[in-house]
Amino acid sequence: MLYRKENLNIESKVVGDITYNIISFIRGRSVVEPQLCFVLVYAAHIALTNNVNDADDLLSFIEENVSEQRAMFVKEVARDCIEVSLQLSKMFSDKDFLAYMLVFPRGFAGKLYAESGTPESLSKLANRILDIKENERVADFGSGVGDFITLVSENKENNYFYGNEINSRYCEISRIRTDLFAKNAHVELGDMFAVAGDKKFEKIFSNYPFGMRLINLNAQTDYLESLHKRIPEIKRATSADWIFNSLIIDHLTEDGKAVAIMTNGSTWNSIDQKIREYFIRNGLVEAVIALPSNLFEYTHISTILIVLSRNNESVRLIDSTSICEQGRRQNIITDENIERIIRLLKEEGEEAVTVDFKTLQQNEFVLNPSRYLENTVEIQDGVEFGSLIKSVTRGAQLKANELDEMISDTPTDVQYLMLSNIQNGMISEDLPYLKELNPKLGKYFIGNRNLLLSKNGAPFKVAVAEIEEGRKILGNGNLFIIALDEEKVNPFFIKAFFESEVGFASLKKIVVGSTIPNISLESLKKLIVPLPPMEKQNEIADLYQAKQDEIKVLQLKLEKAHNALRGIFGEVK
């Protein structure tokens, strides 16, 4: 039987009461997790609607009346607590159980289970953007527990809905929910990269996993090989977001439209520039919406909603980061907020801009709205950068032939730092050594914890020097060597800011010159930077340094692995 959402009269208190009672019944006997709660409520629904009053009879009834896979799922998850379902069936109505399964609360369980779903407000926004018409085929790749399909299938009698989910338990929960609330829905267990290539849809949604790289993606080899032949811009370090987006495009009809939720960084980092160029050059990006932070229960990561379709000559960029209702633990996009965002897709406003190919090309094909919407760069607790600086010098202006004469073939206590020695915000350990220097060059030495910022060229490089005692490093002339007042500001906090999208956009505003972009010292000193309390600065700086240390360890492991590869041939006798 198909149940209508509008007939359930959902009350959050009742849903909460069901969860509370389940926790009370099984406290000390089992770990209370959303899957267990859902299955117990599902079994209570079966018991109540079929007048089953015994635990063994309930398990037997389920075994005889549902699919073998579902029966196994129910027994695997809830066999030891099945009597709780009978207790619930005597306390609540079937409408209460249906409301619970429709809402399926997961927030009480933390990160792991919250990852299985999409916030309702995001599903609603995606639904409004997709504007599903009668008879259209709709897919959700990585459908989790079926949040999107359950929501958008309401009153869609003549549409076909398809879900694909690799986690068997999530898939079965999704199937239960679609059986109850969605007509013409089919949820398939499996890898989305293994979906038949000829399976096409007019509308597609995907809230795929965050923070993955191609090298970590356990996707079908055949698909990736085929994809790389078609899109050589894809590299091993490419963000998985763009691999997922490529898959979505492959399953979209010629006139179709898709919405995906992706990470902020993939819209602007240098690693993904070539694949962004491919998508933009081929007219595959219709719009990009920067979403409010803290929408998800399991992460505070900044996210982007991307609209994919074909034959686009420009891209609509919207900054909706402040268009939300702020909650204590989680932000929500209200129905009113959704309508405002929909209007911004079509109408002018301070938070929206349409950008053509040439402008995108001039901006490294960055797709983050803050790059193009100057008014959106807001700095909280802002001060002029110059007020935090003790001194600024430029590195030594050395000619190539002068430098060649100064290079030492043997280690000395003086080394030379060039721009090429700064990669991904870190200074190389293998800097060239210099012979005895003219004392006049001493003023160009870099101090410990000095902030380094490239003056010319793009993208700009930022680093914090960590110099051991007894070691001297001469800076290149294309560097600002900045000694900060560390009683006011943590250098690693400023580095983290400059490397953020907001910080990058702030730096970009003071850049002059198009052929060779450069930053003037005067403009740099007037630049507004955030200055929160030192406690918060240190917290951000510590997180940044910890992640930087993690990268160094990974780089060392990678170097060792490469060295090991060179010796494999000789190991086999």
Model-based region annotation:
Residues 2-3, 297-381:
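Flexible, glycine-/basic-rich loop-and-beta segments that form/coincide
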Residues 31-110:
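Long recognition/docking surfaces used for binding and targeting
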Residues 112-206, 211-212, 263-265, 275-276, ...:
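Conserved S-adenosyl-L-methionine
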Residues 215-223, 403-438:
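DNA target-recognition patches
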Residues 234-300, 305-307:
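Conserved Class I SAM-dependent methyltransferase catalytic core
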Residues 306, 370, 472-480, 512-539, ...:
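A short glycine-rich beta-alpha junction/loop motif
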Residues 347-409, 423-424, 531-573:
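Non-catalytic DNA-recognition/assembly elements of restriction-modification systems
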Residues 441-444, 448-499:
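A short beta-sheet element
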